[in-house]
Amino acid sequence: MTIQYDIEAQRQIGEIFKYGKKKFGILTALRFKEGIRKKISMLKDNPLTGSIEWELTDEEHEYRFLLVKPYKIIYSVKGDIIRIHLFWHTHRDPNILRNYPIGVCEDVAPYGKE
């Protein structure tokens, strides 16, 4: 299984890290980021481990999420590709998530490579 990140997800993880560094310090931000990476890496062995994200799933696309509080990691699985679409803060209004433009046709890149 290959994990790919949408451009939006790459941007968001950078913002999450910057915010965490400013608010909680570099060590806490690094630990949180590493926790996210480990959780995502577990998907390689069991890509369907995440719960279905019913706010986004429709007849054509199934989206799942992993919870790393306070974020949902929204992803999809197609063939042998696990695609990370976005990081959703759980305190945000879920109505916004329903209408959020998931990058179904957006360029993707492996995490850390642009």
Pin down the residues of each PLM region.
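Enriched for short, Lys/Arg-rich terminal
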Residues: V68-Y71, S76-E114
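Charged, solvent-exposed alpha-helical segments that act as regulatory interaction surfaces
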Residues: K22, I26, D45, T49-I52, ...
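Generic beta-structure capping elements
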Residues: D6-E8, N46, F87-T90
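Arg/Lys-rich, positively charged N-terminal/basic patches that mediate binding to nucleic acids
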Residues: M1-G35
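A short, surface-exposed loop/turn module that caps and links secondary-structure elements
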Residues: S41-L67
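Solvent-exposed interaction patches of small proteins and small membrane subunits
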Residues: R31, S51-W54, L86
